[in-house]
């Protein structure tokens, strides 16, 4: 009791102390026992599961319905107190009341979870104490009878109220719905427990607590049980559609898809849960899935009748119960209606009006006031409770009610009616009762003023001249009466919105007396009022005629009429909205069926169009439907025309015919051509009144065009692909706006269907072409029989002869036939031919076919595949791992090695993806590897190449599976995924690798080891293979630059060629070395592989150090600044402006200038450790040496590598221009050298300040050289103004750092003739004297060294020397930009000095040649001791036309 009291206090109920009396407790226990006994008797007598509840005479059902006082007073009236708020009985609650002391007066028959329980009360409550729910209305009761207490009118909860409660309280409704299912099973029948009922009632009231408790405490089993119990049973009957669906769902590509871009609707399925359990979307009728709903219809005469809402909830109409009520009326001051109800299983269904179960459902019951219900349609739907609507009171009974009670009773009569015609009939009958009128009419507003649909606003008589004795069926036989807007009395009321009360209708000019003449009825008094909705818009007009007593309608009648019509307006608007929603549901179901039908039939265009035509003719109901397809090439004509006529369905072949007729009838080109051209929709009510219609199509034919609806069919791009035309709607009606909307939707689906069918047909054609192409490809990809015969007759040497077991195997001396014979030896030694019964000639042809399908690329060719197979053979035989893998897997591995790069294009997977190649579209991951595998299968399945033909089915499947895994494992991306688990397992014993998963891992790693096996070979082999790989990579990089306009990665960038040694070291450390060390751990016999990798790594490190050393010795920009400071602070200060101008003039190439002879100059070698610096000094203006002792590094200028590579090309291009521009013939120069600047400037451009700086630098070097050579004689400065200059030199090919010493030596011998020894030692410079017409000469000395930079020594006045050559060969020259700063504006400068005639060599090797010079010694460059002998270092000089010497040094 304490718990019950606390719960009652929690819900606001008053708990009486007298409830604690023992007498009442005993009485309660007796009542419970009686109820249990009655329940047991009912179970024994009633075989069905439908519960029967008998009510005690003292039991009063829970109050429900609208109370009159609730209309007049707000819910917050002090005399009203709130109910418990628990779920009402008909909505799944316990029905247990908590008003006053009623708790001990319960007399409950049976405890069923969710079954309505009546409420017992000792004393009836007064009317103003009737409990109200939260909305101000009393909660619905479990019975449908009506009772009054103190004038209160009580009715049952209607299905509409239950549906509204379901929307407002979805959790409670689902709870009730769940227990309705459980209550009908025998295992859930249990006796009533009062304490359990109280707790359940409290939980019903406190849903927030229930949810919170469920979230915190519910177990997984509880949630699963809840989900199972709430699953929709109808969903199990749904048959999946046969229409194909796209695998990736969205974004479809523009290629091959419909192209439709449907936006994602911002709606969630959770939003539909607020309305309770909805009907299933998909149903099954005759084994065919459909979207049309099954079960009793909701929009026919039963709409608004009993069970109309609950029947369709959940899609499966459950069991119903019908209440039969006997009403007893008592003549008290306030009538009290008590009622006795009992359940009757399997009651009638489908009552359409209050008090009649017949109504619109056709059961025969007249919808009279107080009429009894008919038999209904007799359908029984188990599991659902459905309450029959209460019968309407008779007119005599209504007359006994006061005004407010009467209005309230009539409002209840219409508030739950949702069928428009039935509602209008009830409104007119109730209005006649209220106003005591003889008959009435009701008009509804249709159309809009200047609406987009073209319908004008008017009044349509839904019901006309309705009398109290008329029925809905009689009214349906009447024709509609249309009243123009603003015409007549009704039109005036609709337009003005004001009521009209006319005592004598014939006295009003707006009255139309023709109606009376037709009906024979005399209209006298007339009251007409508008019906408005909640927003104040006029939605209808109601009028009543002639009061029964012959009087006129008074102002009181007007007020009563107006008050009642306010409720009628709300009910009428709800009924219209409900009717529209039902029609919208039906339309959506039809469109969904159409979409399903279209997309499940896409085999041919004929089949798809035939289904569209049949569905459209059935829906629109017209005589003929045509679909005309526009010609793709000629948009002004139709390629195909499909006809369908209504009587085609009645022919004998209708069931077997799957395609429509084509071009049976004449085509109306006028209208269809207009639509096909403009895309406009044409709706013609009378074809002969339209100028576009060609009347000749009806000549000589019994068919006549009347109404035409024509619309364009468009694809997703908005292009017109066809026209759909409907002709002659049935019953001589015109095509309406709704028809246009339907045809528009059909046209959209038809366009998608036609597009998809065209794509399907194109796909079929493409597949046929592919089959033919594959057949042709397999024929040409296979080797000929003659080649196989020839290979078959060749003798195959042993594996020892081929050295196939050697890890240092080299195929450099192998011919192609030798590689094929070596492959045959592998198959023979591994016993594949005998074990798998491989035909030897088929094996020969297969090998020839595999070799034929490798492209002639630089590296990934047949030789690479052969070397990979040899390494796999060596590993299998050396380690005896063939015992682990078995013969089948060994066969797959050898085949995989030979085929793992089939049809390789010389590009990797990344390039295929970047280029969006067809291969990348075909395979998303491991693109090339999948292609290699497909090519392998194609060859294996080609006739004459089926080496696996004699394998069993299981062995063949296993070989293919291992083969695919092996080829895909050659992708480094797959290698990185599997390497981690493999490295963790290398310490396992041999027995560990026998299992399937470790064995597959070992196979994958073995493929990678063999694929990269070139890194384990001796250095000569590795070096050769590395050159091939880098060459192929560079080719791909060039393609990425040219075709894709992207910068390749470093390893494929030809500009980063000299960084390849270091990249190769990184490749070994990150990829190769870990896996080979792991394999050496697995088997000691694989240790040579690791040693080979480490040895090659050392060689690559040596090459990388060479590149690094050369790069580190390049002069930094700070040294350039130091040189500039030396020039500005030293000897250059003594230079006069005239000398500077002379220097600048001499710098300009091909321009005559004056030159002065040099008094004297010395050449010496200045060595410091490994860096050798060369300084050449000469004072520009005097013979006195300068005091500045600073030496300037000759290697002060950095040279761009790309410019160095372009140097030779520049010399060739400009050679002709140099020859044409030169005014003097060259003396001993072997070729003419021209070096245009990067900016395209020539040497005739004005002198720039930087050239002045360069001249100063040359003068400083010469001055420094002069101070160091004290033994040199002074010479006179001479100038020449009439000599021209020319350049000569040869190109030097830049070699890669990957080239070996042998190649470089061979290259040097080729270029230098027999004096190749000079390439490895200090070059000897031979002086040659050249005399000209002038007594003075022009001397040029230009030194240049190139590896990653250039070195230039320039002097205006220097030592005169003759033309020099190295080893008697031509001059070697390479010109690059001089300085990095301002390189885009500075031309390439060639230093010019005077002739060094008569200068002896410092080392005594050479002597004076013409009596004018001093000895000039050879020297070693400062890079000589740090570079390997096989790397090239180049110097070049340029001479003038008088015989200036150019010299180059190659190291």
UniProtKB/Swiss-Prot annotation:
Provide the tissue specificity: In adults, it is enriched in Malpighian tubules.
Sequence positions that bind a divalent metal cation 1: 864, 900-901, 1011
- What segment(s) does the record annotate as region Disordered? 1-54, 75-100, 125-169, 235-262, 327-374, 1109-1171, 1200-1248, 1268-1305, 1325-1364
Q: Which controlled-vocabulary keywords does the entry list?
A: cAMP, cGMP, Hydrolase, Metal-binding, Repeat
Q: How many cofactor units bind, and how?
A: Binds 2 divalent metal cations per subunit. Site 1 may preferentially bind zinc ions, while site 2 has a preference for magnesium and/or manganese ions.
Source species, domain of life: Eukaryota
Which Gene Ontology MF annotations are present? Answer: 3',5'-cyclic-AMP phosphodiesterase activity; 3',5'-cyclic-GMP phosphodiesterase activity; metal ion binding
Limits of the PDEase domain = 783-1107
Instruction: Give start-end positions of Low complexity composition bias.
Output: 24-45, 135-147, 160-169, 341-355, 1142-1171, 1218-1234
UniProt-listed GO biological process terms = cAMP metabolic process; cAMP-mediated signaling; cGMP metabolic process
Q: Which reaction does it catalyse?
A: 3',5'-cyclic GMP + H2O = GMP + H(+); 3',5'-cyclic AMP + H2O = AMP + H(+)
Q: Where do the annotations place a divalent metal cation 2 binding? A: 901
GAF domain: from which residue to which, for each copy?
419-572, 604-754
Please give the SMART domains that the UniProt record associates with this protein.
GAF, HDc
Q: Where is the composition biased (Polar residues)?
A: 77-91, 235-248, 1268-1277
Q: Where is the composition biased (Gly residues)?
A: 356-374
EC main group: hydrolase
Specify the protein name: Dual 3',5'-cyclic-AMP and -GMP phosphodiesterase 11
What organism does this protein naturally occur in?
Drosophila melanogaster (Fruit fly)
């Amino acid at each position: 009791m304490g718990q019950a009291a606390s719960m009652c206090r929690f819900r606001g109920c008053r708990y009486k102390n007298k409830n604690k009396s023992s007498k009442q407790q005993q009485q309660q226990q007796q009542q419970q026992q009686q109820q249990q006994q009655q329940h047991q008797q009912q179970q024994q007598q009633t075989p069905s599961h439908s519960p029967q509840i008998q009510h005690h005479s003292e039991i009063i059902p829970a109050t429900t319905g609208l109370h009159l006082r609730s209309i007049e007073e707000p819910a917050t009236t002090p005399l009203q107190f709130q109910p418990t708020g628990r779920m009402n009985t008909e909505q799944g609650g316990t029905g247990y009341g908590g008003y006053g002391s009623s708790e001990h007066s319960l007399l409950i028959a049976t405890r069923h979870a969710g079954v309505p329980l009546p409420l017992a009360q000792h004393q009836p409550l007064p009317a103003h104490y009737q409990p109200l729910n939260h909305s101000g209305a009393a909660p619905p009761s479990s019975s449908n009878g009506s009772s009054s207490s103190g004038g209160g009118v009580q009715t049952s909860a209607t299905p509409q109220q239950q549906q509204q409660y379901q929307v407002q309280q979805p959790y409670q409704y689902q709870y009730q719905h769940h227990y309705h299912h459980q209550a009908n099973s025998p295992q859930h029948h249990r006796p009533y427990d009062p304490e359990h009922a109280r707790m359940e009632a409290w939980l019903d009231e406190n849903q927030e607590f229930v949810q919170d408790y469920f979230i915190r405490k519910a177990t997984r089993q509880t949630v699963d049980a809840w989900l199972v119990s709430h699953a929709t049973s109808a969903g199990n009957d749904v048959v999946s559609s046969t229409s194909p669906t796209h695998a990736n769902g969205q974004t479809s590509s523009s290629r091959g898809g419909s192209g439709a871009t449907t936006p994602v609707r911002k709606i969630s399925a959770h939003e539909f849960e607020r309305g309770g359990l909805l009907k299933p979307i998909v149903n099954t009728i005759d084994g065919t899935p459909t979207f049309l709903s099954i079960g009793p219809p909701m929009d026919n005469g039963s709409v608004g009748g009993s069970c109309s809402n609950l029947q369709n909830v959940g899609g499966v109409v459950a069991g119903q119960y019908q209440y039969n009520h006997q009403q007893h009326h008592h003549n008290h001051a306030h009538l009290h209606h008590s009622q006795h109800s009992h359940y009757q299983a399997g009651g009638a269904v489908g009552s359409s009006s209050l008090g009649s179960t017949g109504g619109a459902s056709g059961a025969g019951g007249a919808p009279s006031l107080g009429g009894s219900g008919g038999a209904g349609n007799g359908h029984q739907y188990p599991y659902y409770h459905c309450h029959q609507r209460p019968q309407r009171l008779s007119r005599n009974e209504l007359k006994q009610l006061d005004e407010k009670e009467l209005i309230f009773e009539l409002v209840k009569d219409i508030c739950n009616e949702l069928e428009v015609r039935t509602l209008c009939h009830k409104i007119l009958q109730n209005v006649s009762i209220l106003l005591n009128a003889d008959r009435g009419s009701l008009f509804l507003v249709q159309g809009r003023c200047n609406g987009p649909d073209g319908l004008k606003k008017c009044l349509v008589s839904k019901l006309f001249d309705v009398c109290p004795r008329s029925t809905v069926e009689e009214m349906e036989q009447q024709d509609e009466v249309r009243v123009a807007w603003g015409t007549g009395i009704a039109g005036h009321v609709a337009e003005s919105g004001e009521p009209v009360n006319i005592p004598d209708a014939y006295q009003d000019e707006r009255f139309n007396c023709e109606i009376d003449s037709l009906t024979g009825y005399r209209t006298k008094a007339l009251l007409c009022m508008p019906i408005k909705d909640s927003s104040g818009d006029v939605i209808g007009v109601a009028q009543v005629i002639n009061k029964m007593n012959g009087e006129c309608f008074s102002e009181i009648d007007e007020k009563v009429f107006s008050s009642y019509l306010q409720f009628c307006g709300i009910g009428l608007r709800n009924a219209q909205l409900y009717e529209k929603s039902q029609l919208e549901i039906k339309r959506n179901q039809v469109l969904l069926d159409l979409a399903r039908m279209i997309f499940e039939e896409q085999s041919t265009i004929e089949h798809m169009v035939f289904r569209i035509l049949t569905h459209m003719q059935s829906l629109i109901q017209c005589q003929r439907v045509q679909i005309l397809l526009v010609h793709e090439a000629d948009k002004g004509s139709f390629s195909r025309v499909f006809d369908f006529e209504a009587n085609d369905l009645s022919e004998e072949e209708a069931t077997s015919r799957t395609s429509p007729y084509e071009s049976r009838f004449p085509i109306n080109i006028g209208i269809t051509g207009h639509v096909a051209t403009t895309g406009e929709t044409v709706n013609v009510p009378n074809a002969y009144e339209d100028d576009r219609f060609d009347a000749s199509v009806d000549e000589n034919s019994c068919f006549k065009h009347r109404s035409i609806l024509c619309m364009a069919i468009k694809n997703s791009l908005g292009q017109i692909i066809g026209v759909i035309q409907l002709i002659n709607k049935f019953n001589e009606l015109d095509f309406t706006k709704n028809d246009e909307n339907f045809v528009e939707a059909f046209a959209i689906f038809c366009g998608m269907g036609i597009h998809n069918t065209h794509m399907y047909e194109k796909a079929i054609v493409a597949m046929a072409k592919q089959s033919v192409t594959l057949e042709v490809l397999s024929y040409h990809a296979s080797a000929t029989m003659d080649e196989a015969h020839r290979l078959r007759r060749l003798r195959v040497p042993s594996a020892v002869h081929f050295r196939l077991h050697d890890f240092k195997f080299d195929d450099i001396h192998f011919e192609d036939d030798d590689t094929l014979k070596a492959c045959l030896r592998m198959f023979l030694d591994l016993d594949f031919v005998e074990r798998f019964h491989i035909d030897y000639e088929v094996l020969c042809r297969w090998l020839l076919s595999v070799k034929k399908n490798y492209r002639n690329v630089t590296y990934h060719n047949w030789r690479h595949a052969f070397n990979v197979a040899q390494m796999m053979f060596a590993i299998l035989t050396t380690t005896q791992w063939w015992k682990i893998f078995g013969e089948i897997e060994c066969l797959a591995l050898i085949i995989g090695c030979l085929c793992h790069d089939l049809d390789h294009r010389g590009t990797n997977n990344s390039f295929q993806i970047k280029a969006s190649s067809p291969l990348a579209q075909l395979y998303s991951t491991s693109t090339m590897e999948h292609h290699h595998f497909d090519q392998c299968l194609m060859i294996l399945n080609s006739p004459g190449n089926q080496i696996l033909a004699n394998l069993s089915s299981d062995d063949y499947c296993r070989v293919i599976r291992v083969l695919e895994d092996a080829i895909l494992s050659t992708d480094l991306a797959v290698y990185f995924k599997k390497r981690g688990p493999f490295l963790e397992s290398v310490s396992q014993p041999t027995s560990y690798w026998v299992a399937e998963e470790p064995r597959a891992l070992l196979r994958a790693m073995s493929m990678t080891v063999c694929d990269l096996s070139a890194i384990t070979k001796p250095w000569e082999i590795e070096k050769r293979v590395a050159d091939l790989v880098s060459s192929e990579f560079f080719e791909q990089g060039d393609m990425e630059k040219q075709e894709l306009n992207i910068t390749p990665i470093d390893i494929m960038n030809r500009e980063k060629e000299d960084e390849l040694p270091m990249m190769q070291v990184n490749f070994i450390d990150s990829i190769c070395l870990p896996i080979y060390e792991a394999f050496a751990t697995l088997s000691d016999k694989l240790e040579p592989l690791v040693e080979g990798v480490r040895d090659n790594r050392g060689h690559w490190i040596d090459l990388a150090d060479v590149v690094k050393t050369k790069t580190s010795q390049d002069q930094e920009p700070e040294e350039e600044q130091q040189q500039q400071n030396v020039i500005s602070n030293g000897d250059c200060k003594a230079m006069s402006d005239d000398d500077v101008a002379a220097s600048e003039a001499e710098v300009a190439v091909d321009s005559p200038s004056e030159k002065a002879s040099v008094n004297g100059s010395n050449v010496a070698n200045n060595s410091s450790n490994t860096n050798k610096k060369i300084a050449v000094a000469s004072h520009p203006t005097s013979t006195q040496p300068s005091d500045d002792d600073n030496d300037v590094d000759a290697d002060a200028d950095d040279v761009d590598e790309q410019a160095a590579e372009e140097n030779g090309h520049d010399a060739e291009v400009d050679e002709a221009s140099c020859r044409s521009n030169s005014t003097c013939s060259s003396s001993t120069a072997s070729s003419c050298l021209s070096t245009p600047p990067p900016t395209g400037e020539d040497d005739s451009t004005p002198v720039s300040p930087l050239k002045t700086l360069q001249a100063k630098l040359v003068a400083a070097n010469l001055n420094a050289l002069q101070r160091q050579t004290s033994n040199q004689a002074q010479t006179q400065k001479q100038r020449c103004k009439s000599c021209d200059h020319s350049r000569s030199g040869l190109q030097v090919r830049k070699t890669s750092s990957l080239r070996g010493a042998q190649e470089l030596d061979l290259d040097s011998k080729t270029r230098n003739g027999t004096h190749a020894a000079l390439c490895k030692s200090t070059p000897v410079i031979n002086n040659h004297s050249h005399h000209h017409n002038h007594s003075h000469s022009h001397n040029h000395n230009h030194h240049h060294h190139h590896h990653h930079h250039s070195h230039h020594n320039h002097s205006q006045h220097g030592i005169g020397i003759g033309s020099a050559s190295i080893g008697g060969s031509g001059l070697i020259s390479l010109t690059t930009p001089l300085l990095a700063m301002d390189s885009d504006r500075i031309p390439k400068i060639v230093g010019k000095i005077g002739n060094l005639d008569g200068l002896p060599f410092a080392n005594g090797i050479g002597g004076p040649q013409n009596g004018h010079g001093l000895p000039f010694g050879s020297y070693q460059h400062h890079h000589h001791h740090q570079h390997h002998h096989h790397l090239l270092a180049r110097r070049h000089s340029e001479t003038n036309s008088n015989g200036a010497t150019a010299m180059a040094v190659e190291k």
